[in-house]
Amino acid sequence: MTLSRLAAAILMAASMPAIALVSALPAAAQTAEHTLTGNLSLATDYRYRGITQTDRRPAIQGGFDYSHASGFYFGNWNSSISWLSDSNDAVSAPIEMDFYAGLKNTFGADGRWSYDLGVLQYYYPGDYPANFTRPYTTEIYAGVGYGPVSFKYSYAPTNLFGFADSKHSWYADLSANVPLDVWGLTLNAHVGYQKVQVANASYVDWKIGLTRDLGNGFALAVAYIDTNADRTVYTNAGGRYMGRGTAWASLTKTF
């Protein structure tokens, strides 16, 4: 699939549910109880939990989010990927599609505490050989935050991203996004632990970076991302280590 066709597919997947939702909402409601936003990004690499999903090549990404004043939300996010075909050339699955819904809100006297509860489905449409473990994954998550710091726990009752017999894997994520009050910069820091119920597949990932608000809905992010993932587990069929440390950048437009 060419990049232009892939971009069109991602934009179509992101925009169609949003268009349908907007048309169903009264004009006044779109700015009162209901909020609908979209996003489109170009990234030097798609890194998920520290592991490259595009074999260290650029990715195009996009999605939409709907939220209600009650705290209920749902959304869809999509990205170009290559890791499935990189692991087996008989696989043709160039897009990741994520669908999620949940409830998040603030609490406490100062309103600085927050919580987020939800479910996330990862879907990888494509063609797979008969003996290939499907990568479709469901996660249930719970998060709590205070100010710029947040902690999130995600639990997978299904197999995790194509690992056979990996049910009940989980991921713990500690993140901080601290506004620096200079040049529109925010400091981004993250450390996570991916527990995979498969020998030698668990690992730690970390990230340190900066995001700059460019105005008009644009944001530029740069970071260094790394892991301690086992090379024998996270090396693709081409012999390339998927968890290698890397400098990374993305440009995002929110609308």
List each model region and its residues.
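Residues that define the transmembrane beta-barrel architecture of outer-membrane proteins
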Residues: H34, R56-I60, A93-M97, W113, ...
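Short glycine/proline- and aromatic-enriched beta-strand/turn motifs that initiate or cap beta-hairpins
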Residues: Q30-S82, T246, T252
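Surface-exposed loop and membrane-interface regions of Gram-negative outer-membrane beta-barrel proteins
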Residues: A69-R134
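Outer-membrane beta-barrel architecture
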Residues: G63-D65, Y100-G102, G118, Y141-G143, ...
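Cleavable N-terminal export/targeting peptides
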Residues: M1-T35
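Outer-membrane beta-barrel "beta-signal"
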Residues: I208, R212-L214, G239-F255
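Repeated loop/turn-to-beta-strand initiation elements of outer-membrane beta-barrel proteins
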Residues: S70-F74, G108-Y115, P148-Y153, L180-L187, ...
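Transmembrane beta-strands of outer-membrane beta-barrel pores
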Residues: L42-Y48, H68, N78-S82, N105, ...
